[in-house]
Amino acid sequence: MINSRRAIVAAVFILTVFFLLSRSHQSAPSVPVAKDAAAADTSKAAPASNPDPVSPPPEKPKEMEVKQRRTRPRIDMSGMSTYEKLAYAYPYDVETKFPAYIWQTWKQSPDQADFQFKDQHASWTDEHVGFVHEVITDDVAINLIRLLYATVPEVIDAYRSLHLPVLRADFFRYLILYARGGIYTDIDTYAIQSSVKWLPEKIPRETIGLVIGIEADPDRPDWAQWYSRRIQFCQWTIQSKPGHPVLREIITRITKQTLSMKRQGKLEKLLDHDVVEFTGPAVWTDAIMEYFNDERFFDLSRSKGVIDYKNFTGMETSKRVGDVVVLPITSFSPGVGQMGAKEPDDPMAFVKHDFEGTWKPESERHMGEQKEDGGEQQQQQQQQAPAQ
């Protein structure tokens, strides 16, 4: 009898233990655990016949992904100068590629019926397959500047304060190239050759950050009657990488001068003929020449002297100065019939400019007109501006 009772007790004990173990195993998944969701899905999808548990993926790749998404730390920029803010916002890396952007500005967009530069616009698209080609209207331009220069509010203030369209157009080209890089070109220009051919093959692209051309090389005693500088670099076509110091300098200069004249009540008094010195090729040329002689960027101890117009007058092929390539007058002004410029079919001809100058009075639109023989005759450029 005793043995029978012992057997019954033992059986009940074994069944109780089995029941408790079974409940514990079934309730385990409801406990919150720190497992990767992807690993949980993989475990559920595993075949029932596989006794080996599926291990969760390692955490290291996840940490690497977080590191790649990190941005530059925000810092207090209130004590910085405009130049320092610009340098922090868009640091310069000469080894990066030239961005595949083409920037232009006009009152209408190319898809509008009254857009009058369809042939010129198409030439840039045709010669630069795969490039992003944007024609920025005035309304888009101000919003773009607000976005790109949110950390440098004085730049936005200066841009909005400029009352003449040509002043804003000049300023915009520097601003968009500094922030995004690529090519800026006036709406009345034709692309003769792709920009991939602008630099000689012997020059490594990772060593150049700015490509410019000569606008004027007036080798004559009375040059100052016709041009602002003895050598004048054009700014109707510019190629650059983001953050280039020349662009940083000219943006700083225009911003300071604009806001200073605004405070003095002189800004509204600027006239069309002041544009060249304020935002145009004169101040652009000055910024470039100063860059060539700046000890912050060049080892002047190895220089043979000051770099000035003498280094560029009469040149017929490209010339490199540090990270800048200067193209001869034929490259961006072919066919003007003066100052050594050759025809548009010359191998060094890259861009043809119609010299539309729609912001100027009609009497001033053709920059190539110059008097000869004491002013009795005038020589006009071969290319004529489209009818206005």
Predicted regions and their residues:
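Glycosyltransferase-associated regions of secretory-pathway enzymes
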Residues: 1-169, 185-388
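Small-residue hinge/turn detector
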Residues: 170-182
